[in-house]
Amino acid sequence: SVSYRPNHFIPSKKSATPYKALDGRPLDVVNLDSMGGARKFKEKYQGIDGFEVHGYDRYVYTYISDKFPGKIDFDANAIKIATLDIECESENGFPEPGEAIEKVNAISIKSFVKSCVVFGLGEWETESDVIYVNCKNEAHLLTEFIKYWRQEWFDIITGWNVDAFDMTYLCNRIDRLFGEDAHKKLSPWNMSSSREFLQNGYQKTQIFDLYGVNIVDYLELYRKSTFHNQESYKLDYIAHFELGKKKLDYSEYGSLHTLYKNNYAKYLEYNVKDVVLVEELEDKLGFLDLTQAMAYDAKCNYIDTFGMVKYWETIIYNFLKEQGVQTPPQKKHETKTHQIA
């Protein structure tokens, strides 16, 4: 764990101090012993008439700002990025990631600077530039995958719909096979959290946050970073639109499950093609490069660049901090109910 002592600020009786409010009034610093202590201090005095508590209360971002003052010059080559895609049995239809009932039968993970590593369940002779790990069963496959993951410790994992499907399915499937919280091995700190929400207003979606690993979904990144609506956001359509390329065609087999049962070699090639297409999209579009530049400029997490509130709050906080100005107290807004005749 990281020991950090954040500060808050209160109005000063002195005529001048190193810190000032947004309106120029001098402030005194209040040194707190921990982030928990800082939260309690703010909660205790917030909203009390005549007592103002100044200072930014997103302590992760104040820590980054204190730890890395000034402009951050980052080395993009030092950031380890990989594209991930998994395949599951689908005899009973498309598997639900929140339940993860079906067996994982292939995983491809492609470092941006290394060969693709494929974990599968059968013999495969390929001329493509891949490293193939032939596993005895699904438990062996997931064990080998976790071992590789922990050996590499990628900073960013991307892929097409990787956040809502691949990572959610993997985490739930690992827990189903190896016990509750076994998926936490995918975090360098053995810590995670999950949240559920309705996507598009109706689709129940579960997302895992693996502490220490940034999951940056290329589908969401593409949606955010392009300025035209597409007819479809399936990888096959977008790859054809942007690159003139498509996913591997298996129409002669009718379904992905039939392909898996009858031509496992082609099934693995299909899996590999998906991660390669995402990497080629990034080579052309550079959206991950842009995300990194934005995050280091704002001193925030990569995922914060997807929204506007945290991103701009953090930029404003750092700008004001350089002027010796502390962010003003938050005001609670009462919700008024209006009767409509």
Question: Where do the model's predicted regions map?
Answer:
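The two-metal-ion catalytic cores of nucleic-acid processing enzymes
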Residues: S1-L219, S225-A341
